[in-house]
A protein has these predicted regions:
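Extracellular and analogous surface-interaction loops
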Residues: 39-51, 115-120
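Short, well-structured hydrophobic secondary-structure segments
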Residues: 46-94
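Noncatalytic modules at the cell exterior or secretory-pathway interfaces
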Residues: 50-59, 118-134
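Extended, solvent-exposed segments with strong compositional bias
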Residues: 78-121
Length: 169
C-alpha cells in the first residue's frame, strides 16, 4: 500500500510539472445524423511554429437509444465509410462507442480506450470522421490537445507527416 501511495504522489508531481510547461486545449461539440459523418476542425492559425499533440479523444451518444460508432481523427479527409487503418499516416487517433438500451433492466455503454499516435503533431487541419449505425443520433466528442511550440525543423516535419509522407524513424 505504501508503494501505491508513493506512486500516486510521484504521478501528481509529474503532472504538475508537465502542466507548468504545457498548455492544454479542448475541442468539443456534437454532430447529428447516421452513416458516415464528417466534421472539419480547423487548427490552422497561420502560425507555422504552433502545433498540437492529441492526448485524449472521446465520443459518446447524446440520446438513450441503441447506437454505435467508430470515430477517427486525421490530418486529411477520410473517404466515407473507410475502415480505421493504422497503416495510413494521416490517421492520428481512433476510438469507438457502443450503447445498448434494451427493454430489459440491463443497459450498457462502452467507450473503447482511445488509441492515439502521440508522435503525431497537428500543425494545420484536423478532421473528425464518424462511421455510425443507421439511426439518426447525436454524437458528442471531446478532443484534448497539448499545445506545443515547434522549431522550424519540427514544423516542416509535422507538415510532411500531415501530407501522409513517411518521415521514417
Amino acid at each position: 500500500m505504501v508503494s501505491v501511495l508513493l506512486f500516486e504522489q510521484h504521478t501528481r508531481c509529474q503532472r504538475s510539472d508537465t502542466m507548468a510547461k504545457s498548455t492544454y486545449r479542448t475541442l468539443r461539440g456534437s454532430i447529428f445524423g447516421n452513416g458516415n459523418l464528417k466534421r472539419t476542425l480547423l487548427l490552422d492559425d497561420g502560425l507555422i511554429n504552433q502545433g498540437y499533440r492529441i492526448t485524449g479523444f472521446f465520443v459518446w451518444c447524446g440520446e438513450l437509444l441503441d447506437g454505435n460508432c467508430k470515430a477517427t481523427l486525421s490530418s486529411q479527409p477520410k473517404v466515407a465509410g473507410s475502415p480505421q487503418d493504422a497503416s495510413i499516416n494521416t490517421e492520428i487517433a481512433w476510438t469507438s462507442f457502443v450503447q445498448e438500451m434494451a427493454a430489459t433492466s440491463i443497459r450498457s455503454s462502452v467507450q473503447q480506450d482511445p488509441v492515439i499516435d502521440l508522435d503525431h503533431v497537428v500543425n494545420r487541419d484536423l478532421y473528425l470522421s464518424f462511421n455510425t449505425n443507421n439511426i439518426d443520433l447525436t454524437w458528442n466528442y471531446l478532443i484534448v490537445m497539448e499545445a506545443r511550440k515547434l522549431s522550424d525543423d519540427e514544423a516542416i516535419l509535422a507538415i510532411i507527416r500531415e501530407e501522409a509522407q513517411n518521415v521514417g524513424a
